Amino acid sequence: MSTMGKRILRAVAALAAGAMMLAGSGCASLNGNGGNGTNGTPQNSDKVQTFTPSGGKASATLNIASGSENREVAAAVQKAADESGVAVTLNYMGSLDIMAALENGGVSGGTTYDAVWPASSMWISMGDTKHLVKDAASTSTTPIVFGIEKSKAVELGWADASGKTKPVATTDIIDAVTSGKLKFSMTSATQSNSGASAYLAFATALTGKNEPLSADDLNNTDLQSKVAALLKGVDRSSGSSDWLKDMVVANPDRFDAMVNYESLVIQANKQLTQAGHDPLLAVYPADGIAVSDSPLGYVDRGQNLKDAFSKFQQALQSKDSKLEFERAGRRTGLGGTLTYASDAQVQQSFKADWGINTDASALKTIALPAASVIDQALSVYQTALRKPSYTIWVVDYSGSMKGEGKQGVVDGLNAALNPEQAKASRIEPSGKDVNILIPFASKADEPVAANGSDTASLLSAAANRDPRGGTNIYDGLSKAIAQLPSNVSDYTTAIVLMTDGMSETGDRSKFQSDYAAKGQGLPIFSIMFGDADPTQLDEIASLSNAKVFDGRSGDLAAVFRQVKGYN
């Protein structure tokens, strides 16, 4: 217990310092510094993937901070490793974590990086304050689009029966949201590139000007009200583009629209159609669209790996690698066109009856604003424009939490809910957020609520509650369900369960009945640490279309931020 408590405290300190690693969902890892793979076979784990040349021993190894979306182009990376003779270890994380690593001199969580590969150049522009990044160049592109289930797109008048979509203005999207005809899932703009890029594109298009977003634009109340009206359509948030795609694929009857990379809409459609479901149609906003340019750049720390980097970067531009990029749904041609449009497998990705438009004219790409404006835009999003969150924190105060365990969790709640601490990670509460604390042990306590950014009383209650008794997560969850808002569509709502032990099961059936009757399909995310039972938590996640965050090792503070990215 003491070891776990110390780990929590270290993690919270890391969050307060703003140096956090966000685990990318998707590829599965060996350890924070990569691993030794067999020749020509990517070695996988949930955070790290290592590629070694198939021809024999590597001439060098590059440690790369990579966006988690790059797991989908593993075949292209392997081709480049084979051709260059250079091994690479991709450490998957969010684009904002890559930015933070650059701000820290190419170091994060004790790991040093030789290169960065975020989803967009804007994270290099914002994070490379020490001017370490050299020779950054795009590896491929993919626009951020709406993926809308075919019958819904036809109903909205945005597509015909063949799957061909029509130009849709951002104001048309607002009208569909306002009328109640469109709801969509989208990643958090402060935690994920796809969400941030889409948000910037919406705001830029709604200015009506053919120029980058400005600080004055962000202070315009009319623009703010339009963007807020559009974001009211978000019915599920996420901190990961990959996880968002997987959620939609797993629940096609529950989620019929998402904002995501075109490449992930393509991947989703391959899975949906194989399972006998209708595809999502790609809808490209006609007055402004963001494009992920996926740049790879060398982080010059004096480590003398520039030649190896150049070989690998050049190999990524080879025919073999570019073909694999396009087969995975990325674009490699000038202006967002395809280089290998005649390839049969590329054609199976870029299908017209999925609404995919490979003509460059379909991409009215916005110009990104200055880094300072992006920073301001993300702050305005978090504090004023996003749909408010309604979060119920169900927290374990059983006897095993006594001492450092309790203090660590209390400090973690402060890191997530104290406005000044949370601001460092762009997760600070807005004036309309609602947070509710439900401590539990053998039984659940009465809830403590906090409205807006005034979370002091809730945090005080968390600090003053003494650990004692057993572990009964189900009573805590039933009490949380009773606290769900009647106007649930006005919020992005979630229950967050934190536990360090195996639960008593006497109230399990009651919880399941309560969730079926009143849970409204809302997610119950779990943070698992100590001796928590993953079987129990996985069952809850499966029931509620959520996920379990593993805080048993590594940076637990990052988990707090990651959870808020999903809410």
Predicted regions located by residue number:
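Von Willebrand factor
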Residues: 384-498, 526-536, 555-559
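VWA/integrin I-like adhesion module and closely mimicked acidic/polar interface patches used
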Residues: 405, 464-467, 501-554, 560-563
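Extracellular/periplasmic juxtamembrane helices and adjacent flexible linkers that interface
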Residues: 26-42, 55-56, 299-391, 414
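Periplasmic-binding protein-like
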Residues: 137-146, 224-230, 238, 275-305, ...
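N-terminal segment of the mature folded domain
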Residues: 36-191
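Bilobed periplasmic-binding protein/Venus flytrap-like ligand-binding cleft at the lobe interface
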Residues: 161-175, 183-190, 201-202, 295-332
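Ligand-binding pocket segment of bilobal, Venus flytrap-like solute-binding proteins
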Residues: 209-284
